[in-house]
Amino acid sequence: MAELNTHVNVKEKIYAVRSVVPNKSNNEIVLVLQQFDFNVDKAVQAFVDGSAIQVLKEWSMTGKKKNNKRKRSKSKQHQGNKDAKDKGERPEVGPLQPQAPLVQNGHMNGCEKDSSSPDSAREKLALTPREKKISILEEPPRAQRGITEGSRLLQQKMSLDGNPKAIHGPSERSDGLQWSAGQPCNPSKPKAKTSPVKSNAPAAHLEIKPDELAKKRGPNIEKSVKDLQRCTVSLTRYRVMIKEEVDSSVKKIKAAFAELHNCIIDKEVSLMAEMDKVKEEAMDILTARQKKAEELKRLTDLASQMAEMQLAELRAEIKHFVSERKYDEELGKAARFSCDIEQLKAQILICGEITHPKNNYSSRTPCSSLLPLLNTHAVASGKQGNFSRKSSGHNKPNEGKAANPKMVSGLPSTADACQQTMPTNKQQNGPSNQRRRFNPQYHNRLNGPAKSQGSGNEADPMVKSNNRHEHRRQPHNGFRPKNKGGAKNQEAPLGTKAPEAPPHSEKARRRQHAADNLETRPFRGNVGRVSQCNLCPTRIEVSTEATVLSVPAVTLVA
């Protein structure tokens, strides 16, 4: 019962791992659990981190797992003791059989049937690497069979709850396990029983195959891809560095010129203050000279009272004062600002320096065998871009095509609108003429039904409507259209007559064309509609009030 509880615990651990990783098969979960000594947390962490893929690769590729030798030896010793007990109970399973690599209890390359003692396990571990390589090269199908049998063995462990025959004690279960472990080693046994399990094992093997093929196909290109990725990431970093350098340089430029500006302002302030001082000093000197001149002038006024010696002294003073007038002129020019602006501008222009980037990159011409691939990729990307543009641009012609029938179908409605607009304008402009004179068409309309009997009775409604339209198309004296020539040329084929025609001629024309109007009515209506559409743009500005006001005019005439 203890071993049964162990299997139940294994199944519960499988379910616990599957609840976290639902897209993994039972075989993969069991192999990873065996790798981590059925520790659920470590197995789940391995699936999450992706290290479970490497574990599964080690299970699928025989002879590659080199660690855990101590663990293997201990498990083999334990299995050897267990097999010795089984041999004592069932001696018929005793003969040795050829070994095949089998996945069992977390280690590889061992058939537990032969390991009757710990010495045999140690002998197996003492194989040289060369012998291991030879065994791997000579027996690849056996390795696959070992993986298949290992997965089948694990499935048997999981199905212990549903199989009542398996619960009879540890001896029978161990015999069943030994039989399943010994089956791939015996070539004479039939392989039909292992067919249901073989369908799952190659699938797991095929999942690992593309990665191995990719590694075998281009081990060097992976290093190049990593180098390219590092270089690409560094380009992004350098781009950020350029932006940072530009920002810092801009700040430095602003700071430098702000300092220059402050220096210039300070110099300007100092020069202005100095100029004020110069002005004040010059004014003081001139004021003193002015006082001296005033004093000499006052002395000259007193010259009549002076002695000869005093007059001589006064003349000498005046002569000295006058002789210094050249200094007065220099004093007037003393308040002058001078600056070598050109030299300063040249110094400012050469102030500051910016280093430009140097394009030291060299272009390498690709090999002739690589050019077709590059051209094909470029053409494919170009076609894809053009296809996306065309697909986005195909909607516009369809919209245009869809809009054309609407425009075509809108022509009759426009013609009808024009036809309705023209009579409205004529009725709006011509009620005064209709009230002033006798209109023979309305007179004939009132007397027509009594005179036309027999065959004329069928055509009377058409004739009335035709006369009504003809009267609406008839120009009046009060309305002068802008295109007189066009109106005359277009209304002449319609058979419209001037209102001065006598009544009997209008009656004769109506009787003559009464029968023809039944057949020619659609054609004439269309012609009239087109002709009115040609005149429509000049009369398109019609308000709703004009349409309402035109109705009483027709009613009054009728």
Curated annotation (Swiss-Prot):
Q: Which residues carry this modification: Phosphoserine?
A: 120, 455
State the species of origin.
Rattus norvegicus (Rat)
Q: Which residues carry this modification: N-acetylalanine?
A: 2
Return the similarity comment: Belongs to the SPATS2 family.
Report the GO terms under cellular component. Answer: cytoplasm; nucleolus
Polar residues bias (residue ranges):
416-433
A Pfam match is: SPATS2-like
Q: In which residue ranges is the amino acid composition biased (Basic residues)?
A: 63-79, 469-485
**Ranges annotated as biased composition (Basic and acidic residues):** 80-92, 110-142
Subcellular localization(s) per the UniProt record: Cytoplasm; Nucleus, Nucleolus
Q: What is this protein called?
A: SPATS2-like protein
For region Disordered, the annotated ranges are: 63-148, 161-202, 383-514
Q: Which UniProt keywords apply?
A: Acetylation, Coiled coil, Cytoplasm, Nucleus, Phosphoprotein
Coiled-coil stretches are 279-344
* Classification via InterPro entries: SPATS2-like, UBA-like_sf
Q: Which PANTHER family match?
A: SPATS2-LIKE PROTEIN, SPERMATOGENESIS-ASSOCIATED SERINE-RICH PROTEIN 2-RELATED
